[in-house]
Amino acid sequence: MSLSNKLSVKDLDVAGKRVFIRVDFNVPLDGDKITNNQRIVAALPTIQYVLDHKPKVVVLASHLGRPNGEVNPKFSLKPVAAELSSLLGKKVTFLNDSVGPEVEKAVNSASNGEVILLENLRFHIEEEGSQKKDGQKIKADKEAVARFRKQLTALADVYVNDAFGTAHRAHSSMVGFELEQRAAGFLMAKELTYFAKALENPVRPFLAILGGAKVSDKIQLIDNLLDKVDSIIIGGGMAFTFIKVLDNVAIGNSLFDEAGAKLVPGLVEKAKKNNVKLVLPVDFVTADAFSKDAKVGEATVESGIPDGLQGLDAGPKSRELFAATIAEAKTIVWNGPPGVFEFDKFAEGTKSMLAAAIKNAQNGGTVIVGGGDTATVAKKFGGADKLSHVSTGGGASLELLEGKELPGVVYLSKKA
């Protein structure tokens, strides 16, 4: 799966056409009030670009929440239509469904670049292809899924996908359009450009920074990156499993991953074979409980962490070591914080790592932050705009870094 040769919205002739854009408007709601409109704002450049090129109609489609394949007013996209209208400075017509004769009629009778927002795609079981009933997964009928995809295709002449956050899902709106031209929107294209920079053609030295609780959750990630990078910083909870297995360090009540422990020797062996430097913490900030009010202490690899205490952050020497490792790199992919940054007392390791990453980017390095917790870090402590790229897709970026193909990306047309 090449990331760098996909058709972009800029390659399309949209004049007079029905342009279907799969966006990610999965915004947080409090009742019918949007509490954070960032995802809507992020889609504006693609929508505006298409509008500037005289389409017949722009049809926008998204999911919101997890309605489990049935209509649930709580997850309606209706509030998004009003917000989008005020951001675009243009009327947005909201339809009460995403497929069917009424929707087709509204789309086909639109003109002069009208903007239509469809109702939540996931109100139909055929979008995700299954639903949960009494703890069981029930698959959608194959013929019904094919029909749903045909109904979506009937609304469009060209297809644009700007929903990177859902690119790892083979959902109908991501892979179901029987159209010649299936292009990436600006958001999607930016994600692909940056991940291609790292995974297909990195400027070296290439560093991966990995955090998170369990080695077993990140095994595919570590294994894939060991074939690509020059060094890896292992931080967060999973560092304790590494140091206990490798050096028999006492880790007290810190996280230990039994299943992951069995995998550590193989990963270390592969790192040696590939000449990849593994950088582990050498000291820790400890706590007497997993709490923001915990009593804080310090421990080193030499002293070990006594029983009754747990490591919740990287200590001062580890911060220096991590900063020095970051300073040497020219390309960095960061997925997972080095400590429990949600608690102020245990956020210093994460803040110091972010500062080092920002400095690297300002000195010309490429610093890519995977979605999820690490994107939250960049937002919380300020710095998202100073890094090269903060991904909008937690699950999607993780699967890319694990070396998996993303259905929504594979499905995009190649550049001619």
UniProtKB/Swiss-Prot annotation:
Q: What range does the record give for the signal peptide?
A: none
Chain positions recorded as CDP binding sites: 212, 217, 236, 336, 341
Compartment annotation: Cytoplasm; Mitochondrion
Q: What class of enzyme is it?
A: transferase
Q: What is its EC number?
A: 2.7.2.3
Q: Detail which positions bind (2R)-3-phosphoglycerate.
A: 23-26, 38-39, 62-63, 65-66, 121-122, 168-169
**Cross-referenced Gene3D superfamilies:** Phosphoglycerate kinase, N-terminal domain
**What is a single cellular component term in the Gene Ontology annotation?**
cytosol
In which domain of life is the source organism classified?
Answer: Eukaryota
Q: Which reaction does it catalyse?
A: (2R)-3-phosphoglycerate + ATP = (2R)-3-phospho-glyceroyl phosphate + ADP
Main location, first listed in the record:
cytoplasm
Residues recorded as binding ADP, renumbered to this chain, are: 212, 236, 341
Sites binding ATP sit at 213, 218, 237, 311, 342, 373-374
**Cofactor(s) the record lists:** Mg(2+)
**Its Gene Ontology molecular function terms?**
ADP binding; ATP binding; metal ion binding; phosphoglycerate kinase activity
Q: What does this protein do?
A: Catalyzes one of the two ATP producing reactions in the glycolytic pathway via the reversible conversion of 1,3-diphosphoglycerate to 3-phosphoglycerate. Both L- and D- forms of purine and pyrimidine nucleotides can be used as substrates, but the activity is much lower on pyrimidines. Negatively regulates the biosynthesis of acetyl-CoA from pyruvate in the mitochondrion.
The record's similarity note reads: Belongs to the phosphoglycerate kinase family.
How does the annotation summarize its subunit structure? Answer: Monomer.
* Annotated HAMAP family: Phosphoglyc_kinase
Q: What is this protein called?
A: Phosphoglycerate kinase
Its taxonomic path starts at:
Eukaryota, Fungi, Dikarya, Ascomycota, Saccharomycotina
Q: Which gene encodes it?
A: PGK1
